[in-house]
Amino acid sequence: MKKILILGTALLCGFLCRVAAQGVEFRDLTFGQALEQARTENKLVFMDCYTSWCGPCKNMLKNVFTLPEAGEFMNAHFVCVKYDMEKGEGIGLKKQFAVRAFPTFFIIRPDGTVQHRLAGGSQWERFRERVARGLEETTSYAYLNERYQQGKLARKQYPHYVQALKDAGDRPAVKNVCMEVFGQLSDKAKCSAENWYIFDQEMGPADPRFEYLSLIHI
């Protein structure tokens, strides 16, 4: 009996190791089935929106999502699916989620609402950081954007909100929020280290922030 238990444990460990080693498991599910599976497994849905001609999309699928460490992390937290935005169900999903660039990735709750949005690919280490922000409710795009729209976003949360907007690829919103904060801060506060993020985002020579920096001596 003891030998059987040991053998069973060894086989299970071997199976789990192989699952992790295979990289991210993209399941062959419809979007509705993915949401249902996420409810069953108490996970979120990770959706990869790609096209057949997109070079960065191919790079993510071939060189990033195939990594064992990517599989270990992603498979533990998500029901992962991918859809070609120009074929089948992907055509409707592209419109539903307003996908404008490729690749775009979504972290979606089991009720179908978006928790976080990621525009563009990257190397695994950086991509993991971006995904991790979306996993954490208080640093996710949905949470921070809702707080902002309600006028309840605390000053210390603004850097996280700007980062979430960057993750989503919303460059106009990044600039608008940084300009908003810039206009509200005193000169002393603008020079404070925790507020320097407003000068690091979407700033050109004609920007008031650029003019401000040119007039001060640091």
Language-model segment annotations:
Residues G88-F102:
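Structural alpha/beta surface segment adjacent to cysteine/selenocysteine redox centers
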Residues R100-S140:
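Non-catalytic, surface beta->alpha helical segment in thiol-disulfide oxidoreductase systems
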Residues M1-E25:
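Bacterial Sec-dependent N-terminal signal peptides
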Residues E41-S52:
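Short active-site neighborhood of thiol/selenol oxidoreductases, capturing the structured segment around
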Residues Y148-I216:
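Oxidative protein folding and maturation machinery
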Residues E25-L29, L67-E89:
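Thiol-based oxidoreductase modules, predominantly thioredoxin-like and allied folds used
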Residues C54, I216-I218:
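Conserved small/polar residues in nucleotide/adenosyl-binding loops
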Residues Q22-E41:
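N-terminal leader/targeting and pre-domain segments
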